[in-house]
Regions:
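Bacterial N-terminal signal peptides that target proteins for export
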Residues: 1-9
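N-terminal secretory/membrane targeting signals
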Residues: 10-14
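N-terminal signal peptide c-region/cleavage motif recognized by signal peptidases
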Residues: 16-19
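Zymogen propeptides/activation segments of proteases
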Residues: 21-304
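Extracellular hydrolytic enzyme modules, especially secreted metalloproteases
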Residues: 271-273, 277-371
Length: 371
């Protein structure tokens, strides 16, 4: 389901088309535990195409596959304009990178590698039809949320009331997704969120998958031999997880047939969000918040196809699991593009903090003329 608004056209011309999108994060605090038990406090920055760990001075940190330690990174040039980010011997949090000759801040992948990562999310042409654009941009849109955890995890402990407040709070001072879109649309659109499996009082109830978290993380010969090794394997594992989650809900806690989940009557679920327990990891992988399309299989809720979806991580903290992020992702569903600059080798950020589609603030800021 997409919103057709003429001013979207200009913004769409400013970015490359892609089937996946999300809001970027910058300097989000994370903790990593070294093999010897030491705690490493660092940061993560990036988006679903590419993200990296770094310290407070922006020295990139990677995991050494030989011993599992988080270390400072260097680059190795492979050919003109291309390079690889590689681990060094210098353990992050132990040495001062400023004193090590050859270590430099701001290291990341080269432009071509980034573009290759972006293309991995494109929907292959001819494989599946895309949801048609209806032009409907007002009325009641019912957002479906499905909670997910892995076989080696206990239930989500975030109180349901906290999550519901970010989505549905309608009080006068609320900054929820519902209140945001009601305000910016001048009361033309009401977005209500419904949760499955149905919560038990103030306790979240989630679908528990048959496989552990490590199955959905990258393969590592030392630290994760259970992980995926190719991009196709990653996609199949993610899509299969989401398919099982939908099928579980259909069988055990079904969406009522009276709930209109296809506001524009195009045959597709308007918006579905999978909230997965846990937080993001440091390098690009499956478990990072993103929007994609379930293009390689047909999954249905009450006869409506599940196609475009959002994936959010419940444990990613107030910086990312927030109404601001939900509003950014919902704007994608309504047709808005990302306005932040994906990759140019600089910190230039387009319209910057003036538009929710470029950067996220708390509370979420309004859109600009480009959205």
């Amino acid at each position: 389901m997409k919103m057709t608004i003429k001013r979207f056209v200009l913004a769409a011309l400013l970015m490359a088309a892609s089937a996946v999108s999300a809001s970027p994060v910058f300097n989000m605090p994370v903790v990593r535990i070294q093999p010897n038990g030491d705690t490493l406090h660092c940061f993560v920055s990036g988006d679903e195409f590419y993200h990296r760990l770094h310290d407070a001075d922006d020295y990139t940190i990677v995991q050494n596959p030989r011993n599992g330690y988080w270390v400072y990174a260097d680059t190795v040039h492979t050919r003109a304009g291309r390079w690889q980010v590689v681990p060094t011997q210098y353990v992050a949090g132990v040495v001062n990178p400023h004193t090590i000759a050859g270590l430099h801040p701001h290291l990341g992948v080269d432009r071509e590698t980034w573009l290759e990562k972006q293309k991995l999310f494109d929907v292959p042409k001819g494989n599946v039809e895309s949801p048609k654009t209806s032009g409907v941009n007002h009325g009641n849109l019912n957002n479906v949320v499905i909670f997910v955890r892995f076989s080696d995890e206990t239930e989500i402990t975030t109180p349901f009331s906290n999550i519901n407040a970010m989505f549905n709070d309608s009080s006068a001072t609320s900054t929820s997704m519902y209140s945001y879109f009601k305000k910016v649309s001048y009361n033309k659109i009401n977005i209500l969120t419904h949760y499955y499996p149905t919560p038990s009082g103030n306790t979240v109830v989630s679908y528990q998958d048959s496989l552990p978290r490590s199955y959905y993380q990258p393969y590592d010969s030392t630290t994760n031999t259970n992980g995926y090794q190719t991009d196709d394997e990653r996609r199949v594992r993610e899509f299969s997880l989401l398919e099982r989650a939908v099928n579980y809900v259909n069988a055990n806690s079904p969406v009522p047939s009276t709930l209109n989940i296809d506001m524009d009557n195009d045959g597709y679920v308007d918006n579905i969000c999978f909230v997965v327990k846990g937080t993001y990891t440091g390098w690009s992988d499956l478990l990072w918040p993103h929007k994609w399309s379930l293009w390689d299989r047909q999954v249905y809720i009450n006869g409506k196809r599940v196609y475009t979806f959002n994936l959010q991580l419940e444990g990613s903290g107030d910086h990312y699991f927030s109404s601001s992020t939900f509003c950014h992702e919902m704007f994608h569903t309504l047709g808005a593009p990302d306005l932040y600059r994906y990759y140019v080798g600089t910190n230039v950020s387009g319209v910057g903090s003036w538009d929710l589609m470029c950067s996220n603030t708390t509370p979420p800021q309004h859109m600009s003329a480009y959205t």
